[in-house]
């Protein structure tokens, strides 16, 4: 028996410090509890979970932090130490996985998704998705990035890309660092609100070099999570050393959130920013505290990235953010939250035009997936994947965009979701 949960964010609380395990220990002394932070880069666990995982005040794991106070764990684990707890948690059954995938598909169709990029899957889950698609249980198209583990790399890389009409497996998901909200993002200079802390690399630069060299010898794409400016700098430098020798790599920097100004100029159609505009409007309330005024200018700089790259791929990053792509579109063009704050838009010089935002969610996203010849626009010869909305999001006022409702979702010309009044 175990209690699992997700969604806490100390930045939304009056006391913005990390929580502790004290209340969980009182309420659940004999049942392990693991509550994942909203960004997925921290866990709050109770003492029972710590004991089962063998974690104490002396535990150190490269690439992460066991938060302690007076030499004892507080219950918060940041990045890599989370794996120690995850290893002792019960795994979902095959039937539970099937039910979850079907439920996720229905939610996706409801919000007009026809292709989902799943950033980090193991071999077993990829083969399950393929099986469910082949037997007609799953219709959703999936661009599956394999998790960076020896087993996955050894299985998929020698075989080459696996591509069907529903599934594309041709990329590797790597984590360079953690998240800004949990101060796990790797920064060049210390955090403005934690002067002795710079965050940490989950995958250091030497390891990134070795992995990139291996991937570059295959037909796989490298897609690396990079939030902090130190992480982005390392990833872009490693990418540049490799992509110059490749004809059409389309390697992606996932999030590309905080960058040193000269590094923004290094984006191109070979090194693509894969961005999530909702991060800007979710983080804007506290990002300045983490980064300070000067660094903040080069954070969430989507229009500037577009100027150099020529394209940007837009995503929602669910379940970190809401699955609804209309909220992504709204955040990209308005740089406001759902209450219309701030009226002038957060760093409005980096908002995207409606045309760029739409391309980032369609044609450019397809290009970033090597799928621009099959999808991304309504043209003869491409798959008939499209949605009908109840309003024209290219024309209505900004405030009406979040409420846009999907009337119908079409996949391969077939209606897979309908909500017609």
Can you annotate each of these PLM segments?
Residues 132-136, 158-167, 244-246, 267-270:
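Acidic (Asp/Glu)-rich catalytic clusters
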